[in-house]
């Protein structure tokens, strides 16, 4: 009888242990992990929520083996409906498909995408000549689908050679374009064709230590412009800063740093709300430990009662 009880107790312990292991496994598989894309190297995540209820991320692609930022090519799109399981929709555009692009390709840097009046507009920087830093153009590709079928339509004319396009569509339907780099950030209103500036680009006043990576979002009637700075201390680099305004083109009031440096030489982020939770997207070098083989990440973002942003906690 005693042996039977011992045997029953052992069985109960084994079953309990098995159930606990299964629960831990389920919890692990349902948890967000960073980086969330691990089969290729990705950077510069531009996150958007479209009408199908999914969150899409448009990312640049670091190609291995690394040779600086000049090899970046072949934009990819990823999507999710639960912030855990991600679908790679594959490549949507490469340098060889850009008619006016530099003959040696590469240099497909941080992109953005918006949806307006039935069309997805994909904006990307790419040089048109051998002197790449003097010949940047902001290309535009369009599609009827968020993750396939993009065709290059041309580029925005009469712009300075800058990078990091960002397009923001306000609640009234008006579209605004921003770009920058090297300490300069400018913005302007887009025409209805989404391929020309209505008027002139103007400097975004009030930003502190702007470097690049402009992103604009709106919350509770307040416009937020976030960007990377020029931090270079103790082996740490770009911090992410932000400013606010009651107008999409400023002037802006500087608010502070919302993300500390990652382990990468650069950072480039986006901020978006999905299913009632705000998220901060960014990249690091956690997979490769190499500055030019980066990986996109996401963490929750929280606001204080006064609308300021709490410092984002970077997770693994």
Describe each model-derived feature in a short phrase.
Residues 1-32:
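Bacterial Sec-dependent N-terminal signal peptides
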Residues 30-316:
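Carbohydrate-active catalytic/glycan-binding domains of CAZyme proteins
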């Amino acid at each position: 009888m005693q042996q039977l009880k011992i045997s029953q107790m052992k069985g109960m312990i084994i079953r309990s242990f098995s159930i606990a292991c299964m629960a831990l496994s389920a919890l692990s598989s349902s948890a967000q992990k960073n980086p969330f894309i691990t089969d290729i190297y990705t950077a510069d995540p531009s996150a958007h929520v479209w009408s199908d209820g999914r969150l899409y991320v448009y990312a640049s692609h670091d190609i291995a083996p690394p040779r600086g930022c000049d090899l970046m090519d072949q934009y990819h799109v990823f999507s999710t409906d639960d912030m855990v399981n991600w679908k790679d929709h594959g490549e949507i555009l490469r340098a060889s498909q850009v008619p006016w692009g530099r003959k040696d390709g590469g240099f497909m840097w941080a992109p953005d995408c918006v949806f307006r009046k039935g069309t997805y507009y994909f904006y990307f920087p790419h040089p048109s000549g051998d002197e790449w830093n003097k010949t940047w153009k902001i290309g535009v590709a369009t599609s009827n689908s968020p993750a396939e079928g993009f065709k290059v339509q041309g580029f925005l004319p009469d712009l300075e050679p800058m990078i990091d396009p960002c397009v923001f569509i306000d609640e009234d339907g008006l579209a605004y374009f921003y770009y920058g780099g090297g300490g300069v950030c400018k913005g302007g209103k887009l025409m209805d064709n989404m391929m020309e500036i209505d008027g002139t680009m103007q400097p975004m006043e009030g930003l502190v230590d702007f470097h690049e990576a402009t992103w604009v979002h709106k919350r509770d009637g307040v416009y937020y412009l976030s960007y990377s700075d020029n931090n270079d201390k103790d082996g740490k680099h770009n911090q992410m800063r932000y400013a606010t305004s009651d107008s999409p083109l400023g002037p802006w009031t500087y608010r502070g740093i919302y993300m500390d440096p990652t382990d990468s030489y650069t950072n480039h982020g986006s901020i978006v709300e999905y299913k009632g939770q705000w998220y901060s997207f960014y990249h690091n070098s956690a997979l490769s430990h190499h500055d030019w083989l980066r990986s996109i990440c996401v963490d929750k973002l929280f606001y204080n009662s006064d609308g300021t942003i709490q410092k984002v906690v970077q997770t693994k």
